[in-house]
Amino acid sequence: MTGIPTATISRLVTYLRILEGLEAQDVSRTSSNDLAERAGVTAFQVRKDLAYFGRFGTRGMGYTVPILKRELMRVLGLNQTWNVVIVGVGRLGQAIANYPGASDYQFQYVGLFDVNPELIGQSVRGLTVRHVDELRDFTRTTRVDMGFLAVPPERAQDAAQSLADAGVRGILNFAPTVIQPRLLDRSGQQEISDEWRAVIVENVDFLAGMKRLAFYILNPHLSAVETEENE
């Protein structure tokens, strides 16, 4: 499965959210036109996005909501358990740990890590905060699939490296900086480290979202549909 745009995956998440809402309202069928209207894209875009992963509907009859929801859950990997650790257990990290709904999608928090001696040893959501130096030993006995970073920007790269060193394959970075899957070797030349070769990094930047929002408020003629179709 290659050549799937990042924006397509983001839209699949949106379609899933819409389907969950429809199912909660006891709506049994939907269509590409209906999904498109609710998602703010075109029906063509909906069909194109879904076509990357197979055929889910019936021509002229649309989609069965529970079936399409189940298939999108499968495509997104939400039909299996994902073990998650959080590095950085300050206000943001604790808010992430206590955010409701993660367990509904099989995301299970298994470890919390920090460097602040005032936090180490405390209990958050039933988990004891450990020092980040214990991360590698922790992953030897506990499977960890993802790491969420909620650390200051100047510590983000080192924290991400700790996760990569421990064999964690996915990193969701909430620090206001871009994690680079590169390390400087002793000669000063950049190279991809072995630990980073299989690591997927998602950078979540709240300020970037605010900046995009400001742009679209100032440029309302540039609709979401127009920008998606020209990606």
Locations of regions flagged by a protein language model:
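Basic, low-complexity intrinsically disordered segments
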Residues: 101
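Hydrophobic/small residue at the entry helix of a nucleotide-binding pocket
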Residues: 92
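NAD(P)-binding Rossmann-fold cofactor-contacting core
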Residues: 104-125
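Extreme N-terminal segment that seeds HTH/winged-HTH DNA-binding domains in transcriptional regulators
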Residues: 1-28
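Glycine-rich Rossmann-fold phosphate-binding loop(s) that bind the pyrophosphate
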Residues: 89
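Phosphate-bearing ligand-interacting subdomains
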Residues: 15-23, 127-230
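HTH-adjacent hinge/linker in prokaryotic transcriptional regulators
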Residues: 29, 33, 38-84
